[in-house]
Amino acid sequence: MYRLLKALSLALALAVLTIFAASCGSNAPAQVRFVHAIQDANPLDIDVSGPNVTSKQEFTDISFLGIQPNQPGYTSMPSGSDTIEGFLTGTTTEVFSDSVSWGSGTQYTVIATGFSLTGANGSNVVLLSIPDNIPTPPTGDVEFRVIHASPSGPGTVDVYIELNPSTGPGLPVTIKGLAYTQASNYVSFAFNPNNDTVPPGYTVYVTASGSTQPPFFISEPIYPANAGAVRTLVLTDVQDGKTMNTSFLELSDPY
């Protein structure tokens, strides 16, 4: 009987420890970076509030295509369900309000896009909360992914990433049929496959889906500094232009 009670006590203690550890793990903060891509909005202050937020978390005075915190970096936010609000900087004028759900210990790129001057109460602002499942590239490689956050661009685009020197996009398509508000998977490329003295970099082409003909929405080089680099390329609008920007916004993804 004594041995049985001892075994039951041990099992109960282990169960309590397991529940406690799971509870602690579930309370680990999320890691968030914020991008202001609302093409018709002035600089923003961002407030995050919710049941797990003890004091309002803020990103402040973010201009169009601004990123906070400085790259590469994230800000710790309580995991779980929260409310995120955008205000014109230094005012109580609300531009948008939306709910988010952030997983424990997960990294996110949060992008506010769409339009602020049409629709009621920020109804035409779109908030993207995209998990950053950042890979460790294979030895000698770099990795890219693309987020389509351009409301004035095509509904879907094809993305070609070509080693320099490049004369234009060629098959196969690197990222095919990327829809507005969606993020691609990461794609791996050899950093310097020909062992050039100066690594050649790449050219990124963004086209309408199914087309390889100019004019391209984007035709821009990118030069990662070293093998092992991981980058997110965000497609956005031109400020007040109602057209896709001819340059992508480059984010550095730490792993």
Regions found by a protein language model. Name each.
Residues 1-10:
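Bacterial N-terminal signal peptides that target proteins for export
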Residues 10-18:
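Hydrophobic helical h-region of N-terminal Sec-dependent signal peptides
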Residues 19-23:
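C-terminal motif of bacterial Sec signal peptides marking the signal peptidase cleavage site
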Residues 24-255:
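Intrinsically disordered, low-complexity polar regions and short flexible loop motifs
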